[in-house]
């Protein structure tokens, strides 16, 4: 992997393939790292690199990326890492492909920097629907590791950070009204479990004016069709 430093933050990233650029925003919750794609039923690192240049990153304090943790950290510090990496690589405009926590990452980028993105694919985006405690528990599990590191953050800092990240509603980084104003073409591959509620995917598809919902994709019977749908969608908007 290559590294990009911005202040005290070091982001590790990989570039694979050749073609129009795509920023990959990996699953894994607070542990979102590029190698998490390798365990997913649909892996863009396998399926897309013949036609696209893939920019895959480890988010701050995930994988081998590092950054200070403060009580003011929130979704926006991740957003600025992501857009700064694109600036560093001189990528003026690209596609987005994100799974799980990648859904809120994508929404935050699209509502703030719509001119930078041609299209976006959200795979089973996380969202809030009577499941907030599950996200608190997921965060706390990750936070224990960070607190135990040498010179790690305090419990108080991590508690504030947790609430900054997971106290929102719906898609966490965007309200229903904000999603309704996103004009960027969206393809949503529906979630259907505790962390990735079906209701979140459906609501995004209902609200965003240029969104398409693909309901069935994860099982072996549907994966090839889903792969074709993603590639066709990206090519259509390249």
Q: What spans do the regions from the language model cover?
A:
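Conserved HGGG/HGGXW glycine-rich cap/lid loop of the alpha/beta-hydrolase fold
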Residues: 7-66
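Conserved acidic catalytic loop of the alpha/beta-hydrolase fold
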Residues: 77-94
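Conserved alpha/beta-hydrolase "nucleophile elbow" surrounding the catalytic nucleophile
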Residues: 94, 98-100
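Flexible "cap/lid" loop of the alpha/beta hydrolase fold
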Residues: 104-112, 117-145
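Hydrophobic, aromatic-rich cap/lid helix
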Residues: 150-175, 192-193
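Short beta-strand/loop motif that positions the catalytic acidic residue
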Residues: 182, 188-190
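Conserved alpha/beta-hydrolase "acid-adjacent" motif
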Residues: 194-200
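Catalytic active-site module of serine/aspartate enzymes centered on a nucleophile-bearing elbow/loop
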Residues: 211-238
């Amino acid at each position: 992997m290559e590294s990009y430093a911005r202040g005290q933050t070091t982001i590790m990233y990989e570039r694979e393939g050749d073609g129009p650029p795509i920023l990959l925003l990996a699953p894994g919750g607070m542990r979102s790292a590029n190698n998490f794609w390798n365990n997913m039923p649909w892996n863009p690192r396998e399926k897309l690199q013949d036609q696209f240049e893939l920019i895959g990153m480890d988010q701050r304090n995930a994988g081998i990326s590092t950054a200070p943790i403060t009580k003011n950290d929130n979704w926006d510090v991740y957003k600025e890492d992501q857009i700064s990496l694109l600036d560093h690589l001189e990528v003026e405009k690209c596609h987005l492909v994100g799974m799980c926590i990648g859904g809120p990452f994508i929404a935050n980028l699209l509502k703030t920097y719509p001119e930078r993105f041609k299209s976006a694919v959200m795979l089973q985006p996380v969202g809030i629907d009577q499941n907030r405690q599950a996200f608190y528990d997921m965060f706390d599990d990750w936070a224990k590791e960070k607190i135990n590191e040498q010179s790690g953050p305090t419990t108080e800092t991590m508690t504030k950070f947790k609430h900054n990240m997971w106290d929102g509603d719906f898609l966490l980084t965007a309200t229903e009204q904000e999603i309704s104003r996103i004009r960027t073409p969206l393809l949503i591959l529906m979630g259907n479990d505790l962390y990735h509620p079906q209701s979140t995917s459906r609501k995004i598809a209902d609200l965003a004016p240029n969104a398409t919902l693909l309901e069935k994709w994860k099982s072996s019977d549907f994966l090839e069709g889903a792969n074709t749908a993603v590639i066709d969608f990206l090519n259509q908007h390249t």
